[in-house]
């Protein structure tokens, strides 16, 4: 039986840098939404109801794996009256 001798760092280094950045941004947006929901005292159901969405869609948004469109980010920024992301 062969032994696989590869470290997590080696695996991480094989992931293209743009994919790592995409993942970082996705989780940053999810974390921002979670923080803004807590700030407003909203749970997933209340947030979904306020936006006319289903709770499972909010769960997907908070998973860190959702590919947000600019339209959705703009809608969320308007809802919270705060930026979701900033562009420098």
Task: Walk through the language-model features, giving the residues of each.
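N-terminal flexible/basic segments that precede or flank functional cores
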Residues: 1-35, 39-40
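Recognition helices and adjacent regulatory flanks at domain boundaries
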Residues: 22, 44, 86-88
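Generic structural marker for isolated residues within well-ordered, non-membrane alpha-helices
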Residues: 33, 44, 73
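DNA major-groove recognition helix of helix-turn-helix/homeodomain DNA-binding modules
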Residues: 71-86
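Short alpha-helical DNA-recognition segment
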Residues: 41-59
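The alpha-helix within a helix-turn-helix
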Residues: 37, 48, 77
């Amino acid at each position: 039986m062969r032994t696989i001798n590869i470290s997590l760092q080696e695996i991480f280094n094989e992931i293209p840098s743009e994919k790592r950045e995409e993942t970082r941004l996705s989780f940053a947006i999810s974390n921002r939404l979670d923080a803004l929901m807590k700030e407003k005292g909203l749970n997933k159901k209340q947030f979904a109801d306020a936006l006319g969405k289903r709770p499972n869609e909010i769960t997907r948004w908070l998973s860190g794996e959702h590919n947000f469109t600019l339209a959705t980010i703009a809608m969320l920024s308007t809802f919270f009256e705060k930026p979701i992301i900033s562009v420098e």
